[in-house]
């Protein structure tokens, strides 16, 4: 089974610190590598994380403020240098097309990789291609900003002892899958009689935003919500004026959405540590973590 997990490559906001790089988040899932908001220095962060950049197959840019996109050009150039054979899909707000182009073509180099652009100009399902579904929602920030939800499909899992008891084997199994019922020895066997549905996992990624309904919609029942929490409550006035959230506000969104786990990120450089973020959020939503550079959050498939 391929690795399934979220690796934090950076978790600072506008300004990196000695201990936190600009944000960048790698989701390895179902054989693909999804890179969210590669800030400045992302290529180097892969080295420290001991992860080959070639795992990246899709890049998501929430918006075109520098701390969320300055690493895009260098990542594309690195993938080009490594001569990856798979296409690189890039998703971003359509209104930022000119900024995407400036980052992509900011230096002289011979591009040989296949870059497939997906400029997003509407909310809803962006792609649905079997391994997972990509959805976007417009967040409440100073510029066009997208939040993302990645959801894998539900799958049917057979119960071996019930399959055996029903006398099912061979080609009739495929007929059962296709039709939902088969006749075996004068008995009708329904798919539900010998199987159960494994609920597909989902993760929501929320970059810069004020609290809004779109966050709740994106994160509804998600296994993980990766959410910006730039400030503590004592600086809530800054959060409001800069269209960001506090740790408490992020926790309130997670609680409303009934997510399983909340990971806070995008911390202001004014804070040296993140313990207080967890404390403030934990009063609202207990299963909360503060993102740490190079920390990975594994999530094996749901058993049911």
UniProtKB/Swiss-Prot annotation:
Q: Which reactions fall under this protein's catalytic activity?
A: Endonucleolytic cleavage of RNA, removing extra 3' nucleotides from tRNA precursor, generating 3' termini of tRNAs. A 3'-hydroxy group is left at the tRNA terminus and a 5'-phosphoryl group is left at the trailer molecule
What is the name of this protein?
Ribonuclease Z
Q: Which organism is it from?
A: Chlamydia trachomatis serovar L2 (strain ATCC VR-902B / DSM 19102 / 434/Bu)
Q: How does it assemble?
A: Homodimer.
Which cofactor(s) are needed, names only? Zn(2+)
Origin superkingdom: Bacteria
Q: Which residues catalyse the reaction?
A: 67
**What class does this enzyme belong to in the EC scheme?**
hydrolase
The task this protein performs is described as: Zinc phosphodiesterase, which displays some tRNA 3'-processing endonuclease activity. Probably involved in tRNA maturation, by removing a 3'-trailer from precursor tRNA.
State its Enzyme Commission number(s): 3.1.26.11
Alphabetical list of Gene3D superfamilies matching this protein:
Ribonuclease Z/Hydroxyacylglutathione hydrolase-like
GO MF annotation terms: 3'-tRNA processing endoribonuclease activity; zinc ion binding
Annotated Pfam families? Lactamase_B
Any idea which positions bind Zn(2+) 1?
63, 65, 141, 208
Instruction: Tell me the cofactor note.
Output: Binds 2 Zn(2+) ions.
């Amino acid at each position: 089974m391929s690795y399934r997990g979220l690796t934090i490559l950076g978790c600072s906001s506008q300004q990196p610190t000695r201990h936190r790089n600009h944000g960048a988040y790698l989701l390895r899932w179902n054989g693909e590598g999804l890179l969210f908001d590669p800030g400045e220095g992302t290529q180097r962060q892969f080295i420290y994380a001991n992860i080959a950049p070639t795992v990246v197959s899709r890049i998501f840019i929430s918006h075109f403020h520098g701390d969320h996109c300055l690493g895009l050009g260098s990542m594309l150039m690195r993938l080009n240098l490594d001569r990856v054979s798979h296409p690189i899909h890039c998703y971003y707000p359509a209104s930022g097309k000119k900024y995407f182009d400036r980052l992509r073509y900011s230096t002289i180099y011979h591009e040989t990789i296949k870059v497939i652009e997906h400029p997003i100009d509407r909310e809803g399902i962006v792609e649905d291609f079997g391994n997972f579904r990509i959805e976007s929602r417009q967040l409440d920030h100073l510029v066009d900003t997208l939040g993302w939800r990645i959801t894998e499909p539900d799958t049917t899992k057979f119960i071996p002892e019930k399959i055996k008891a029903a006398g099912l084997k061979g080609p009739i199994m495929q007929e059962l899958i296709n039709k939902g019922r088969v006749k075996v020895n004068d008995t009708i066997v329904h798919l539900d009689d010998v199987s159960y549905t494994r609920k597909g996992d989902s993760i929501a990624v929320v970059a810069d935003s004020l609290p809004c309904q779109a966050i709740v919609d994106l994160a509804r029942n998600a296994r993980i919500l990766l959410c910006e929490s730039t400030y503590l409550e004592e600086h809530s006035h800054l959060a409001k004026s800069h269209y960001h959230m506090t740790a408490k506000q992020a926790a309130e969104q997670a609680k409303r959405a009934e997510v399983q786990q909340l990971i806070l990120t995008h911390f202001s450089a004014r804070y040296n540590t993140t313990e207080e973020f967890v404390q403030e959020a934990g009063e609202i939503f207990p299963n909360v973590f503060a993102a740490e550079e190079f920390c990975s959050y594994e999530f094996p498939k749901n058993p049911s």
